[in-house]
Regions:
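Conserved RNase H-like, two-metal-ion catalytic cores of nucleic-acid enzymes
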Residues: 1-117
Length: 118
């Protein structure tokens, strides 16, 4: 399987269509939101693609990324997204809408187990 990896500097292209369900993951320097900066966001439509957005840490101006994350018509899948969403809200100044967190879903569906990763 070949994965199409795209590196985007500072923001997504305006005309990028990833469909109505995407996976999202953030990378930051630590878990303290006010101290540890958000460095990049990874997004995939699940169709052998990976879009890596290297954020401009001097201003975090990423209007196309913000538009995607706040779009309530697009499902954003996270795994244990609490820290991701806290960093996104703090640095990108946007609310992430229509979220599915796989760790929470696992806890709801598999209440007999304590093993849900992370």
């Amino acid at each position: 399987m070949n994965i199409d990896i795209k590196l985007h500097k500072y923001d997504l292209p305006e005309d990028l269509d990833l469909g109505n369900i995407i996976a999202v993951d953030g990378e930051f320097m630590g878990l303290n939101v006010k101290r540890d900066p958000l460095c990049l966001i990874q997004i995939s439509s699940g169709k052998s693609d990976a879009h890596i957005i290297q954020l401009d840490r001097s201003n975090y101006n990423a209007p196309n990324l913000n538009k995607l994350l706040s779009n309530g018509k697009i499902v954003k899948i996270f795994h244990y997204g609490r820290a991701d969403m806290a960093h996104i809200k703090y640095y990108l100044k946007t609310e992430t809408n229509n979220i599915l967190d796989t760790k929470i879903a696992s806890k709801l569906a598999r209440s007999y187990s304590d093993s849900h990763s992370l």
